[in-house]
Amino acid sequence: MLSKEKIARINELANKAKVEELSAKEKVEQQELRKEYLEAFRGGMRHHIEGMKVVDQEGTDVTPEKLKKIQREKGLHNRK
């Protein structure tokens, strides 16, 4: 997760860009912060999805095999 300060800085640069042009240094900073934000977001989303177990209405595990394989590798949901 990104720190509150970094998220605030992302928003600050975005708002400034709407009003005036960012300097070259600010544009580079904005790109780096956005990249870091996306990496954190994608990592969190991947972690969330990898922890899911999908079941149908009868309670049968219908988790996709690709996800089951990842869960086995990570030792999640007692997959063997």
Swiss-Prot record:
Biased composition (Basic and acidic residues): 63-80
Family matches, as InterPro entries: DUF896 (IPR009242)
Major location category of this protein: cytoplasm
GO cellular component, one term: cytoplasm
Keywords assigned: Cytoplasm
This protein's record includes keyword Cytoplasm: yes
Compartment annotation: Cytoplasm
Record has Cytoplasm as a keyword: yes
Entry-linked SUPFAM superfamilies: YnzC-like
Disordered as annotated region, ranges: 60-80
Family annotation (Pfam families): DUF896 (PF05979)
Entry similarity comment: Belongs to the UPF0291 family.
PANTHER family named among the record's database cross-references: UPF0291 PROTEIN CBO2609/CLC_2481 (PTHR37300), UPF0291 PROTEIN YNZC (PTHR37300:SF1)
Name of the protein: UPF0291 protein EF_1580
Originating species: Enterococcus faecalis (strain ATCC 700802 / V583)
